[in-house]
Curated annotation (Swiss-Prot):
PANTHER family: METHIONINE--TRNA LIGASE, METHIONINE--TRNA LIGASE, CYTOPLASMIC. Belongs to the class-I aminoacyl-tRNA synthetase family. MetG type 1 subfamily. Zn(2+) binds at C142, C145, C154, C157. Its cofactor is Zn(2+). A motif ('KMSKS' region) lies at residues 320-324. This is Methionine--tRNA ligase. Pfam families: Anticodon_3, tRNA-synt_1g, tRNA_bind. One of its GO terms (molecular function) is methionine-tRNA ligase activity. InterPro entries: Anticodon_Met, Met-tRNA-synth_bsu_C, Met-tRNA_ligase_1, Met-tRNA_synth, Methionyl/Leucyl_tRNA_Synth, MetRS_core, MetRS_Zn, NA-bd_OB-fold. It is found in: Cytoplasm. CDD domains: Anticodon_Ia_Met (cd07957), MetRS_core (cd00814), tRNA_bind_EcMetRS_like (cd02800). GO terms for biological process: methionyl-tRNA aminoacylation.
């Protein structure tokens, strides 16, 4: 069996932060290193995603070429991954010639197989810049809150928007007023693959259950997919002036980057005895579990993913990470202050991969000092120091002559090897690390119970220390995928190779491998983080003062939600019927991710009643419900603190 491990392509608009490391890169590197350790045929392929609107926007605003932006961040991202100890057999760029050619060949095959068609759509066009404008190239006034908004989203009120909904829209490059023009786009017949995708997902035995459920829910309402964009930066669609939508061409990078290894790429993508594991963050689960397999099925030549392994979100000190709000810890900054292996240990031990978890500096210090160092570090150091002092090398004995308590610990080593193997292959990386920690606890207990310092019989002492060193060697072997640098440092002290055999080599002079984290460093990092937050808050845009007459223009009333239902086409919107006393109104609200429809019925809310009606996702909205949102993205509806009748004025 062959294994192909891939990691989500990092977007070249910034360096990596701890969230990237936790959800994607460290877990993928662990299984890659482990399978390699076990002698499996395995490769790890990754790279960077270089196309899409955000990169062209950044380039145009900074007066640089997209190539310059891409090159800068591609190099920074690779440096970050090197610092984390993440290894690749191939690491490419989607702006490389090999990728562009592979993506175009893939597209032409989809077209040849009848899965591509053209359809006329309407889009904003800038007559000054002489080009069509994707969502993010258009900004204007939000029709709901009056704040500055992008063509796809209002940062002020959190609403999902369509570009045509904006008031006073303008081109973000020249600030000119755009026109609405017709253009032909290319579509992928994803809806035609519903049956094949359902069958694939249901039969994917190694696919994590939560990924299966999410994919099957999406497949219920499968729509064809607009796969072209009217911009110049990207992979050109053959025979057109358009480029491919980034989510069509980026996953093809897994194939094109494997091609960087030469003809062996065919073994992993064309021959059937291969398992493909895609490691990603959970925000792009659907792209990898539905869209990408759909593309592969339509193409007809390549292996399908065996498993899509989606990692949960990482919050920071209890708050949602935000690069724009400077509430973030960059990989480069972190490893300047702390060992990368400590980060690898902590991020895996904090929670199962599929669940969200929080990074806390204090918890990081406690887990490393009180768990990793006090248990694993303490046991390995005691054993190697004592053995070096007594014999200068690992004593080799006949295992058949060992006492029962010795054999029990060695049996525990074998059981741990089996448990770790099963858990890592099932993507239960935390469970496997707990298995390793428990073996160290057993080793410590054995060492204490045997009291080697009190043993006068030299042969018996050799048996005890052989058993301890065998346990240390097992720990080092199993820890290597998690903490490669620390494991290799321990192996160097033992003068051993990275396997499970004890050779009785001369030990090197012991030294402390696992050093405790200094609380001073922790406080410095926390101070820097909170200072960044204060600076962002101070530097934030202050709203101008207004006259009370502005407030008098707003008709605010208490409403009671009498009906609430989902809008299936939208990820954020709910359709509500609100009683305002003398009438009922239909209101569309972007609170889907925060409230269930059934929990809203009967709730008193505050409504802006004289907002102009507008359509969201094709659904008429006749008002706006007010809600509060904090810096961490938590949302709470505004309500009244005691019962008051619907329709009451808010003054």
């Amino acid at each position: 069996m062959r294994y192909l491990i891939t990691t989500a392509l990092a977007y070249t608009n910034g360096p990596l932060h701890l969230g990237h490391a936790r959800s994607t890169y460290i877990p993928a590197d662990i299984i890659y290193k482990y399978l390699k350790l076990r002698g499996e045929d395995v490769i790890h392929v990754g790279g960077t995603d270089n196309h899409g609107v955000p990169i062209t926007l950044t380039a145009e605003k900074e007066g640089k070429s997209p190539e310059e932006i891409v090159e800068k961040y591609h190099n920074e991202i690779k440096e970050d991954l090197d610092l984390l100890g993440v290894e690749f057999d191939a690491f490419g760029k989607t702006h490389s010639q090999i990728h562009i050619e592979t993506a175009q060949e893939f597209y032409l095959k989809l077209k040849e197989n009848g899965y591509i068609y053209e359809k006329e759509i309407e889009q904003f066009y800038c007559p000054n810049c002489k080009k069509f404008l994707p969502d993010r190239y258009v900004e204007g006034i939000c029709p709901y809150c009056g704040g500055e908004a992008r063509g796809d989203h209002c940062e002020v009120c959190g609403r999902h928007l369509e570009p045509f909904e904006l008031k006073d829209p303008y081109c973000v490059i020249c600030k000119g007023k755009p026109e609405i023009r017709k253009t032909k786009h290319h579509f992928f017949k994803l809806s035609a693959l519903k049956k094949e995708l359902e069958e694939y997902i249901k039969n994917a035995k190694e696919m994590p259950e939560h990924v299966k459920n999410m994919a099957l829910n999406w497949i219920k309402e499968l729509h064809d997919w607009d796969i072209s964009r009217d911009i110049s930066w990207g992979v050109p669609i053959p025979g057109t002036n358009q480029v491919m939508y980034v989510w069509l061409e980026a996953p093809i990078g897994y194939i094109s980057f494997t091609k960087m290894l030469g003809e062996i790429w065919k073994k992993y993508w064309l021959e059937k005895d291969t398992k493909i594991y895609h490691f990603i963050g959970k925000d792009i689960t659907v792209h990898h579990a539905v869209f990408w397999p759909g593309m592969l099925i339509a193409h007809g030549s390549f292996n399908l993913p065996t498993a899509v392994v989606s990692g949960g979100y990482l919050t920071l000190e209890g708050r949602k990470m935000s690069t724009s709000k400077r509430w973030v810890v960059w990989v480069k900054d972190f490893v300047k202050n702390f060992d990368a292996d400590y980060l690898r240990y902590y991020l895996i031990m904090s929670a199962p991969l599929f669940k969200d978890c929080d990074f806390s500096f204090d918890d990081f210090k406690n887990k490393i000092n009180n768990e990793l160092i006090n248990i694993i570090g303490n046991f390995t150091h005691r054993v190697l120091t004592f053995t070096h002092r007594k014999f200068k090398k690992v004593p080799i004995v006949d295992e058949d002559r060992l006492k029962e308590e010795d054999k029990e610990l060695l049996k525990k080593c074998e059981e741990t090897l089996e448990a770790v193997d099963k858990n890592i292959r099932s993507f239960k990386f935390r469970d496997a690390l707990v298995n390793i920690l428990h073996l160290a606890i057993e080793g410590n207990s054995y060492f204490q119970k045997m009291e080697p310092w009190a043993v006068d019989d030299e042969e018996r002492l050799k048996e005890i220390l052989y058993t301890c060193c065998k346990t240390v060697k097992t720990l080092v072997y199993l820890l290597y995928p998690y903490m490669p640098k620390k494991s290799l440092a321990l192996l160097e002290l033992m003068n051993e190779e990275l396997d499970l055999e004890l050779r009785g080599n001369e030990l090197k002079k012991p030294k402390i491998i696992f050093k405790k984290i200094d609380n001073k460093k922790i406080e410095e990092m926390k101070k820097k983080l909170y200072e960044n937050k204060k600076e962002e808050t101070k530097g934030g845009e202050k709203m101008e003062q207004i006259d009370i007459s502005y407030l008098e223009k707003i008709d605010l009333r208490v409403g009671e939600v009498v009906e609430a239902e989902d809008i299936p086409k939208s990820k954020k919107l709910l359709k509500l019927m609100v009683d305002l006393g003398d009438e009922k109104r239909q209101i569309v609200s972007g609170i889907k991710g925060y409230y269930k429809p059934e929990d809203l019925v009967g709730k008193k809310v505050i409504v802006i009643c004289n907002l102009k009606p507008a359509k969201l996702c094709g659904v008429l909205s006749e008002g706006m419900i007010l809600a509060a949102e904090d810096d961490e993205g938590n949302v709470s509806l505004l309500t009244v603190d005691k019962d008051i009748k619907a329709g009451s004025k808010v003054r």
